[in-house]
Structure formats: C-alpha cells, structure tokens
Amino acid sequence: KRLLGESGIAVNQVIPEGGYLNYLKDLPRAWFNIVPYREVGLMTAIFSEKEYGMPYISITPMGISNTANFIAQIEKLVNMWASALSEKRLNYKFYVDNQTKFV
C-alpha cells in the first residue's frame, strides 16, 4: 500500500484485509488487480480478468529488479487507462531511479 500511495495510486480494496462482504460489489471499480503472492488471489484475479476485463499484475515487489518490474507494469496499466480517459500519462522512471539509487 505504501508503494502505491507514493506512486499516487488510490487503493480500492485490499482483500481480505478489513474486507466485508458488502465491499465485494465495488471490486469491478478497480482499473487492475495486484496479486503479490501467486498462492493467494491468483484465481480471483484470473476470474476478474475474464469476467470484467480487468488486468492483473502478479509480480512480487521484492528486491530491486522485481520492484522496478512491478512499477513498470503499474505504469503501463495506469497509462492505458489515462489514454482512454484523455488524462496525463505517468512516468515512474524518476521514482524507480530515486528508490534504487543508494542500494
């Protein structure tokens, strides 16, 4: 959640953290799903992609390379929506460079 917040991305829901059955109706509002651990949630993400056309990212953001790849996938999906909504495209290169500069 911290990484997404620093990237300017609002989180719709984190399941099952603090989840209620009533909140499930809001799941299709998300632009994409994140499955940081393939053992948990991958089947739901695949279902959401088939049912709602909602893409997902299944990269675990651990380590420099995977985190940079994770952010690149987010950038790609956010910019896909930005193009559809005629909004400004994002570039997270500076963020990735800044986060990995001293490692």
Swiss-Prot record:
Keyword 4Fe-4S set for record: yes
Reactions catalysed, as given in the entry: chlorophyllide a + oxidized 2[4Fe-4S]-[ferredoxin] + 2 ADP + 2 phosphate = protochlorophyllide a + reduced 2[4Fe-4S]-[ferredoxin] + 2 ATP + 2 H2O
Cofactor note (record): Binds 1 [4Fe-4S] cluster per heterodimer. The cluster is bound at the heterodimer interface by residues from both subunits.
Cellular component per GO, a single term: chloroplast
Keywords associated with the record: 4Fe-4S, ATP-binding, Chlorophyll biosynthesis, Chloroplast, Iron, Iron-sulfur, Metal-binding, Nucleotide-binding, Oxidoreductase, Photosynthesis, Plastid
Record Gene3D superfamilies: Nitrogenase molybdenum iron protein domain (3.40.50.1980)
UniProt pathway: Porphyrin-containing compound metabolism; chlorophyll biosynthesis (light-independent)
EC assignment: 1.3.7.7
One of the record's GO molecular function terms: oxidoreductase activity
InterPro entries referenced in this protein's UniProt entry, alphabetically: ChlB/BchB/BchZ, Nase/OxRdtase_comp1
Xref: Pfam families: Oxidored_nitro
GO biological process: light-independent chlorophyll biosynthetic process; photosynthesis
Cofactor(s) required for function per UniProt: [4Fe-4S] cluster
This protein's record includes keyword Glycoprotein: no
Primary enzyme class: oxidoreductase
Subcellular localization(s) per the UniProt record: Plastid, Chloroplast
Function field: Component of the dark-operative protochlorophyllide reductase (DPOR) that uses Mg-ATP and reduced ferredoxin to reduce ring D of protochlorophyllide (Pchlide) to form chlorophyllide a (Chlide). This reaction is light-independent. The NB-protein (ChlN-ChlB) is the catalytic component of the complex.
Subunit structure of this chain's protein: Protochlorophyllide reductase is composed of three subunits; ChlL, ChlN and ChlB. Forms a heterotetramer of two ChlB and two ChlN subunits.
Cited PANTHER family: LIGHT-INDEPENDENT PROTOCHLOROPHYLLIDE REDUCTASE SUBUNIT B (PTHR33712:SF7)
Stated family: Belongs to the ChlB/BchB/BchZ family.
Descriptive protein name: Light-independent protochlorophyllide reductase subunit B
Annotated organism of origin: Nephrolepis exaltata
Gene: chlB
